[in-house]
Swiss-Prot record:
GO terms for biological process: cobalamin biosynthetic process; methylation; siroheme biosynthetic process. Its EC number is 2.1.1.107, 1.3.1.76, 4.99.1.4. Pathway: Cofactor biosynthesis; adenosylcobalamin biosynthesis; precorrin-2 from uroporphyrinogen III: step 1/1; Cofactor biosynthesis; adenosylcobalamin biosynthesis; sirohydrochlorin from precorrin-2: step 1/1; Porphyrin-containing compound metabolism; siroheme biosynthesis; precorrin-2 from uroporphyrinogen III: step 1/1; Porphyrin-containing compound metabolism; siroheme biosynthesis; siroheme from sirohydrochlorin: step 1/1. It holds the Pfam family TP_methylase. This is Siroheme synthase. It comes from Shigella sonnei (strain Ss046). Disulfide bonds: none annotated. Residues 216-457 are annotated as: Uroporphyrinogen-III C-methyltransferase. NAD(+) binds at residues 22-23, 43-44. InterPro entries: 4pyrrol_Mease, 4pyrrol_Methylase_sf, 4pyrrole_Mease_sub1, 4pyrrole_Mease_sub2, CobA/CysG_C, NAD(P)-bd_dom_sf, Siro_Cobalamin_biosynth, Sirohaem_synt_dimer_dom_sf. It comes from the Bacteria. Keywords: Cobalamin biosynthesis, Lyase, Methyltransferase, Multifunctional enzyme, NAD, Oxidoreductase, Phosphoprotein, Porphyrin biosynthesis, S-adenosyl-L-methionine, Transferase.
Length: 457
């Protein structure tokens, strides 16, 4: 270990930055956030430093560097574009046993600045020892995505509860289980973020007083259309916290690779015309796992409330009194159209968009007359097997046969395939494609040749 990671208490302690440019400004923000009593020395300053000085947040010393500026300091940073001056600052600090950071010169510094994830009072620092700052930044970004934005407020609140929790729960095991519940409770985090004291109190009392082996909860998470990069930040956090993940065929392997390693995985994949697991059985799986006290994520392709039968699953949980929440996802219509260069709406071609399922309950019939109207875009989910019928019905109800159409297979994935043509060709085009596919019908499809960006990557 080349460097010892430490967290310094700098509040109301004298610190010095030598340098008045953009790099010095970034360092100054960190020291000000830490409550340091900051002096900045430079020949000239960018406007932000002047604004801070006018607000009484720091002291500016304009002119050449003088070693006496270090006499009362606990910490110094050399952040000029003059290597000789930076070295001089470092040597003067070293002589006074003051830790000094030299920007972009780790070998000349007695300490280095890590990449920081600030969820105060929770702080995470990532460092490559100065060998690869870009790698440290990339790791910080990945960790940022895993830590909820309001986690710091929850951590601070937890500190206020420690005494009561110690009284309420006799053993370390019980306390640990309580804290695990508290830190993953979305309602408490949101209540703290909104400063909703009533909700904070209610949620806290519920968490403290309910049995530790209480019923679990189910989180319905939309996985998006395929590309793992389109999974929402909150969706990622939920699958990282799950005890059980119940998922279907439309969830990509890349997304499943993000699931917590020790979580149980239950595949309930379905295909058009063939159900691996009946819907009622899926409902019972969710219910059964939650009743064991587990945190269950029902992971569904696209958005769970758009042709995902999410509402049916939640009704079962609601009737059984199981707590649940929903994390929406990017629906296939948005993802597939964007990755195919087809805007769903356009001032010249479409003032509305219709999302339509290719599957209806027995006896169901679509309003084909309204669907055949101009100035709109139609998006058919699960319509591949019904493409010939869709073609026939729309033409019968007045849609022009030359209306542009596109079919998107495996939308947003690296294996995405798009085929386009006219409405009179739709049934024939569908025979060339495989599920999962999405059908898009409307004048906006004609923009695809101009706006198709994804196939060029």
């Amino acid at each position: 270990m080349d460097h010892l990671p430490i967290f310094c208490q700098l509040r109301d302690r004298d610190c010095l930055i030598v340098g008045g440019g953009d790099v010095a400004e970034r360092k100054a923000r960190l020291l000000l956030d830490a409550g340091a009593r900051l002096t900045v020395n430079a020949l000239a300053f960018i406007p932000q430093f002047t604004a801070w000085a006018d607000a009484g947040m720091l002291t500016l010393v304009e002119g050449p560097f003088d070693e006496s500026l270090l006499d009362t300091c606990w910490l110094a940073i050399a952040a000029t574009d003059d290597d000789t001056l930076n070295q001089r600052v470092s040597e003067a600090a070293e002589a006074r046993r003051i830790f000094c950071n030299v920007v972009d010169a780790p070998k000349a510094a007695s300490f280095i600045m890590p990449s920081i994830i600030d969820r105060s009072p929770l702080m995470v620092a990532v460092s490559s020892g100065g060998t690869s700052p870009v790698l440290a930044r990339l790791l910080r970004e990945k960790l940022e995505s895993l830590l909820p934005l309001h986690l710091g407020q929850v951590a601070k609140y937890a500190g206020q509860l420690r005494g009561r929790v110690k009284q309420q729960f006799a053993t370390m095991s019980e306390r640990r289980r309580f804290w695990e519940k508290l830190f993953v409770n979305d309602r408490l985090a949101q209540s703290l973020a909104n400063n909703d004291q009533k909700a904070i109190t209610e949620t806290t009392e519920q968490l403290i007083n309910e049995p530790l082996d209480h019923r679990g909860e189910v989180v319905l998470v939309g996985a998006g259309p395929g590309d793992a990069g389109l999974l929402t930040l909150k969706g990622l956090q939920q699958i990282q916290q799950a005890d059980v993940v119940v998922y279907d065929r439309l969830v990509s392997d890349d997304i499943m690779n993000l699931v917590r390693r020790d979580a149980d995985r239950v595949f309930v994949g379905k295909r058009a015309g063939y159900h691996c697991v009946p819907q009622e059985e899926i409902n019972q799986i969710l219910l059964r796992e939650a009743q064991k006290g587990k945190r269950v994520v029902r992971l569904k392709g696209g958005d769970p409330f758009i042709f995902g039968r999410g509402g049916e699953e939640l009704e079962t949980l609601c009737n059984a009194g199981i707590p649940f929440s929903v994390v929406p996802g990017i629906t296939a219509a948005s993802g597939c159209s964007a990755y195919s260069g087809i805007p769903l709406t356009h001032r010249d071609y479409a003032q509305s968009v219709r999302l339509i399922t290719g599957h209806l309950k027995t006896g169901g019939e679509l309003d084909w007359e309204n669907l055949a109207a101009e100035k709109q875009t139609l998006v058919f989910y699960m319509g591949l097997n019904q493409a010939a019928t869709i073609q026939q019905k729309l033409i019968e109800h007045g849609m022009p046969g030359e209306m542009p159409v596109a079919i998107v297979e495996n939308g947003t994935a690296v294996t995405q395939r798009v085929i386009d043509g006219t409405l009179t060709q739709l049934g024939e085009l569908a025979q060339q494609m495989n599920s999962p596919s999405l059908i898009i019908i409307g004048r906006v499809v004609g923009l695809r040749d101009k706006l198709n960006w994804f196939s060029n990557h």
